[in-house]
């Protein structure tokens, strides 16, 4: 693998030496303050979320729920926004510029949360009204020779500008791009399409201001090993009406193509070069892509490369737990890889475009994405600064051209739950808006279908006689939660193809097994990972109904999901602590039963057990004594879940053994633990890069003399970091905790805590020292390379 990466590095280094395009990383050494005078400014690096650092704001005694928008789930003023105060952050950076002749310069922002304004040398030069999409500003004639002062103002807007915690600031990459001034590729210029799993067509948007009578574009396709597998050159004559045009290369055939799929997500690289008259490279742009075929239909749901695939996934907001909105690639990949371990193959980007790195990591790891642009189509829910109708076209253009070449993107979603909003620009449940937006999308990509996630699926809350008008317009019928209408709607409208775009974790199991899995596309579990914002009420800082806590620790119910998302034999044992009656939210019942894996209980007490399994039957043993064997229920409401009530507690070990065809294939046990005797540290990143952005997640556990996690230990830990790295977040998974995430201490919760370190720019020996009042100091030796 190292040889392959080096080969790619040398190929593209050589090509870039020939070309004039360059990208300068501007992520480092910004000054940040909460006012434009930069009072008490501090040095930060991008990505950065200024809101995550702020204190929690508890609701005052007189704050009441706001039910004017049932979907907003507003329990108090800041409950939807994660109990963080709204505000503005100011960023300042000095850019030293040495002008080069015939060169064009662009500032490239991948996003500013939630809205942003950009100033160069005191002059307002641009910004964004919807910070989830990127933008660029041509600064060719604005940059001075020598020092230039770049200032960015980022605003969270008011608390009603979003239904969830957004974070605030420069939460994605910033760069300075330079290209030739007279002939160059435009922003996100390449459009790469494939046919019949072997043919590739490449077109590109470019500008030519030279006197050349023809423009030549050379297209080269490389496989993942760096071998050239196809090449062609396209020609286009001058266009007197427009200097910015599109050039399309002839279709290329790839011999013995390797397909992109979920298990082997093979990626090719397309390198496009605009050539000068002497054959040298004027500008160059490269992008990864995959060769694959996607199909949708009412009789089979979804096919990838001709084979039926069920989407098994989740839908969450863009934030990353204790890191807030800051889009760290390592944190994103950690999530993706964990979800794959639990049988997932799909993520819906609710309800906005995630970072470009997220999409690229889904390409790399074999995840299918429903790529979503908006929540509701109103000013309030799309930045709140300007009318929605003023910016949707530019948002769509940026979003689609950025992601259209990624094989992981299988479906476009233009919005979410919009038809219930009374403030729509047109009073027809979104149909007019959709009909205006869809042609803009298809102008830039016609290879994928388009949907909108609908809830309720009907015209209003009072009737469910027919699907809403918008469901008659979309290519795919995406219903949030209302999977029970798939059969009836399918009979009345046999052309419909169904996707459960949000599924409740409270109804987990039945909302999978009760669907006709032969015909549906699949589902995405809403809030499968706990997140900040959309709190059901203080002290919870956010959504707590996930099957993974906010630090990514799996809850027992995560294994229930895995039992039907994966074929791997599984049995998982937990204790039902109490049953959550659930609460109504957004027209559905939500909530999760409180379960634990604690087997330290009062003598003489009784325990009710839940066993999740995909085995035929399960045997239960207490200290080696067989308590019985039970079959896996076959009905949809109880399948893969066995309850065992009234077990007399005895200290020791209780174990569940799963059987298939009479053979033991899986087992899981809970044990009575002893007193915690030490803290152990486990780092997750063996290839920690000194790139200024890579992360190291270190999980700390309190263990007994046998190395078992002591779930009842709640000691406070204090952390010190030495070397070229710094602590950027701490967490323990407790959504109710009042502790801050950006600090150097954390109390254990369920015997665990996690520290997240950010690498510096120089390779370094790193030491994390963990102290507490109870345990010996733990020294963790790490290294960045």
Where do the language-model regions lie?
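Short, hydrophobic beta-strand segments
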Residues: 139, 247-260, 642-649, 741-761
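Short flexible loop/turn segments that cap and initiate beta-strands
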Residues: 213-218, 261-268, 606-608, 613-616, ...
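Bacterial Sec-dependent N-terminal signal peptides
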Residues: 1-21
């Amino acid at each position: 693998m190292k040889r392959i990466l080096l080969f790619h590095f040398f190929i593209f280094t050589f090509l870039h030496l020939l070309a004039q395009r360059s990208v300068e990383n501007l992520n480092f050494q910004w000054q940040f303050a909460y006012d434009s005078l930069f009072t008490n400014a501090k040095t930060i690096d991008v990505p950065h979320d200024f809101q995550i650092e702020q204190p929690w704001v508890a609701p005052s005694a007189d704050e009441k729920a706001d039910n004017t928008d049932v979907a907003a789930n507003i329990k108090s003023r800041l409950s939807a926004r994660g109990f963080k105060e709204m505000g503005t952050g100011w960023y300042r950076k000095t850019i030293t510029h040495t002008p080069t002749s015939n060169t064009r310069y662009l500032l490239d922002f991948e996003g500013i949360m939630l809205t942003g304004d950009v100033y160069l040398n005191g002059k307002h030069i641009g910004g964004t009204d919807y910070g989830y999409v990127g933008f660029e500003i041509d600064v060719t004639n604005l940059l001075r020779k020598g020092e230039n002062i770049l200032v960015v103002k980022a605003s969270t807007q008011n608390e009603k500008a979003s239904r969830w915690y957004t974070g605030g600031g420069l939460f994605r990459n910033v760069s300075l791009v330079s290209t030739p001034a007279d002939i160059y590729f435009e922003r996100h210029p390449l459009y790469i399409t494939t046919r019949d799993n072997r043919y590739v067509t490449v077109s590109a948007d470019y500008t030519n201001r030279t006197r050349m009578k023809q423009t030549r574009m050379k297209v080269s396709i490389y496989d993942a090993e760096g071998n050239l597998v196809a090449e062609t050159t396209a020609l286009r004559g001058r266009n007197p009406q427009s200097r910015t045009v599109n050039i399309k290369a002839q279709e290329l055939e790839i011999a013995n193509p390797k397909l992109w799929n979920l298990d082997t997500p093979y990626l090719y690289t397309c390198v496009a070069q605009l050539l000068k008259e002497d054959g040298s490279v004027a500008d160059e742009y490269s992008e990864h892509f995959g060769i694959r075929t996607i199909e949708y239909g009412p009789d089979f749901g979804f096919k990838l490369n001709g084979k039926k695939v069920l989407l098994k996934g989740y839908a969450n907001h863009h934030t990353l737990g204790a890191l807030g909105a800051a889009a760290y690639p390592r944190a994103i990949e950690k999530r993706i890889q964990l979800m794959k371990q639990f049988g997932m193959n799909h993520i819906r980007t609710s309800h906005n475009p995630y970072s470009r790195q997220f999409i690229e990591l889904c390409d790399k790891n074999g995840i299918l994405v429903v790529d979503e642009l908006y929540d509701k189509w109103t000013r309030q829910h799309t930045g709140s600064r300007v009318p929605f109708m003023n910016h949707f076209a530019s948002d769509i253009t940026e979003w689609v051209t950025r992601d259209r070449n990624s094989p992981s993107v299988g479906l476009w979603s233009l919005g979410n739950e919009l038809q219930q909003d009374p403030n729509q620009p047109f009073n027809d449940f979104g149909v007019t808006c959709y009909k205006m937006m869809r042609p803009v999308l298809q102008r830039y990509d016609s290879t994928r279908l388009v949907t909108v996630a609908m809830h309720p699926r009907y015209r209003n809350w009072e009737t469910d006689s027919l699907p809403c008008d918008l469901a008659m317009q979309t290519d795919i019928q995406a219903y949030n939660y209302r999977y029970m209408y798939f059969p009836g709607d399918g009979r009345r409208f046999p052309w419909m193809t169904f996707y459960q775009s949000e599924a409740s974790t409270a109804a987990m199991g039945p909302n999978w097994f009760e669907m006709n899995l032969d015909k549906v596309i699949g589902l995405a579990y809403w809030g499968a990972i706990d997140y900040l914002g959309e709190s059901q009420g203080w002290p919870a800082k956010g959504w707590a109904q996930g099957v993974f806590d906010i630090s990514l620790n799996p809850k027992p119910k995560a294994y229930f999901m895995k039992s039907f998302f994966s074929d791997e034999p599984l049995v998982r044992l937990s204790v039902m602590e109490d049953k959550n009656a659930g609460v109504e939210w957004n027209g559905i019942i939500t909530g999760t039963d409180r379960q634990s894996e604690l087997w330290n209980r009062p003598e003489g007490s009784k325990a009710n057990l839940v066993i999740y399994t995909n085995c035929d039957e399960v045997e239960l043993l207490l200290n080696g004594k067989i308590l019985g064997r039970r079959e896996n229920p076959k009905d949809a409401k109880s399948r893969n879940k066995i309850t065992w009530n009234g077990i007399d507690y005895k200290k020791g070990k209780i174990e569940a053994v799963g059987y298939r065809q009479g053979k033991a294939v899986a087992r899981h046990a809970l044990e009575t633990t002893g007193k915690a005797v030490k803290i152990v540290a486990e780092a997750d990143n063996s290839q920690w890069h000194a790139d200024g952005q890579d992360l190291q997640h270190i999980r700390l556990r309190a263990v007994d003399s046998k190395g078992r996690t002591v779930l009842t230990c709640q000691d406070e830990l204090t952390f010190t970091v030495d070397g070229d790295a710094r602590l950027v977040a701490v967490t323990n998974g407790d959504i109710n905790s009042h502790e801050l995430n950006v600090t150097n201490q954390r109390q254990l919760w369920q015997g665990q805590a996690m520290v997240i370190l950010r690498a510096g720019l120089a390779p370094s020996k790193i030491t994390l020292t963990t102290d507490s009042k109870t345990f010996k100091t733990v020294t963790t030796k790490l290294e960045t390379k």
